[in-house]
Amino acid sequence: IGSGAYTENSMVMGTAEGGLKIMLYNVNAIDIDNPYIDSDNPYQDKSNPNKDLNYYFFHTMHHEFAHILCQKKSFPTDFNLISASTYKSTDWINVKDADAPKDGFVSGYASGEANEDFVEIYSIYVTHTASAWAKILHDGTVWTKDSTGKEVATDTKGTDAILEKFKIVEDYLKNSWNIDID
């Protein structure tokens, strides 16, 4: 769809319907003469007028594709329990992507509810570099400096939750769809 779609408080980048169809929105924003792709930065600057094809389109395609997979075959319900007490429901819009890992999420949007959390893990992992994924995991840990100035992990709950959920995503893809996420 050429134009954007909006809810009362956010822009809709894509939808997945009936286990068959994916719709992408705002494709008129693509600058075909000057494509911009950033797979190294896991925290997109959404104020940048140059639309990052990775964030706005490739990530969205994979995000919606993962919804299609989950509409066809449900993922294990154990996933829902890992962050059950920390989902933000409608307040996810106020969670900055760079702050989300400390709470165990790969993006602010992932903090909304389990289905979005699951597909965000998949879509961010497959559309970003290994160093971008490592940054998310690093940012999921609270770090302090010891007396020598060396970083010391003081709280790994965020990283631990992301890795636990990632393992479920990885196993689901392998066991349900014979997809190796790597």
Over which residues does each language-model region extend?
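Active-site-flanking segments in enzyme catalytic domains
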Residues: S3-N9, M13-D182
